[in-house]
Amino acid sequence: MCSIPPLRLLEVVDDLTCLVNSSQYSRWNFFTFTLPGFTLPMRKEFTSSCKGSFSNHPVPDHPCKLVVFFRPKMVVTAGADAYLKILEYGVKKTQLRIDRLLLQAFMAGIFVAMAGHCCTVLAGSYPTDPGDPLAVAKPTQKFIYGALFPVAFICIILTGAELFTGNTMTMLICYFQKRVTMLQLGVNWLGSLAGNWLGALFGAYFLSYLTGALGDEHVRQFLFRTCVNKISYGWGECFLRGVGCNTFVCLAVWAVIASENVAGKVLVMWFPIVAFCVGGYEHIIANMYTLQAGLMAGAPVAILDVIAFNFLPTLLGNIVGGCLLVGAVYAYNFYPTLSYTETTGAKVYVQEVGPVLDRRSSMQVSMTEREPDGQVVTEYEAVPFESFGGEYIVNKHATMAAPIPSRASSFLYPFQWQRQRSQSGNLSTHARLDLPNRPVEPPSDGLEVTPQSQTAESVAQQV
């Protein structure tokens, strides 16, 4: 039976005032609330919330656990949430060992080279001589090139490869928020740039030059014209083209991180990449492939001119575009308002399971039972725990009709949760669970819950 990894402690309210475990299964997410000392009264409507702080408190006799399953509704996150995702995304990059960083950057360079090869062969296959019946206009040739090039970025994003141009934005944001050091930023930039160059060189030689694909006259002439044009710009013009290019690339990365599904990532990435291609902007890694392939094929350009009049200004322009026009602007924009609140709602499964807890350490929890008219009936307070008597994981190939652990019942209830991020970057979650007088039957695509032993200490160590 295939199962997802065990639950892990994900979000904590005010210095561990509420233990919330989270995991994912297909379209479902679930939180686990440990609320000892309380048995759910199914005859009345009530609202429960976790709050308080560590304290010694009398332990009641009947602890229980709520497992809340819900389907997330959000497809694209708001600007502040996307910014925080980028921040976390960048911090993870610094945790890569240098060999893995170089390998992933090498693969990104190969992806760019492969896409550049396909674009060159396809666009170059069309003649531009007006007398040729197969001739196409140069703007059409440029669009053909640009429409295919996003394949490289799709491969990079979906495989987690390291592309230097996107890293200029993410690492600067992390540095601005003091989540990485200047040394970590420099290692990431230099490692990804070196790996990208090696990958582009490998692709140009082994996947383009040695394959003989550049031997076609139309393709070779197209490649030669492209190489000559790229070193014919003035230094300042090439620099500004690099600024524009990486602005588009970093906006594409931003959109990809904000999107929650693969189809959305592909769609939001495609158009900015096509835009920089047809706009004539300069991308340092793409140029590494194109100009190196041109030199191998005999393009009438000198290697020193390539470095001085294209690689250097394009590199600096890409850094400025990614760091200043995107990274610094939005770091400045979102830093003062980093504290935010996000609320969502969903229908959820609730399993009441008890007793499951050790009775030694304690954490204060309060719950309020209310009548449908809002009148407070009873207030519950107390508990905690040191270890779980039975954690739960979701198993594949299961149905809700299957047996559920002892003293557990399943119902479908409205559920709201509120996620808050402080300016220090701490994330907290407040949950609201409304139990109506009459439970709703679970839907047909339910999930089976099976025991998984795990102590509170081992869970807390994963934060």
UniProtKB/Swiss-Prot annotation:
One of its GO terms (biological process) is nitrite transport. InterPro entries: Aquaporin-like, For/NO2_transpt, For/NO2_transpt_CS. Residues 424-463 are annotated as: Disordered. Its main location: membrane. Inhibited by p-chloromercuribenzene sulfonate (pCMBS). Methyl methanethiosulfonate (MMTS) inhibits L-lactate but not formate transport. Inhibited by the Malaria Box compound MMV007839. Inhibited by BH-296, BH-317, BH-326 and BH-388 compounds. It is found in: Cell membrane. Inhibitors modestly slow the asexual reproduction of parasites. Frameshift mutations that are likely to render the resulting proteins non-functional, have no significant effects on tachyzoite proliferation in vitro. This is Formate-nitrite transporter 2.
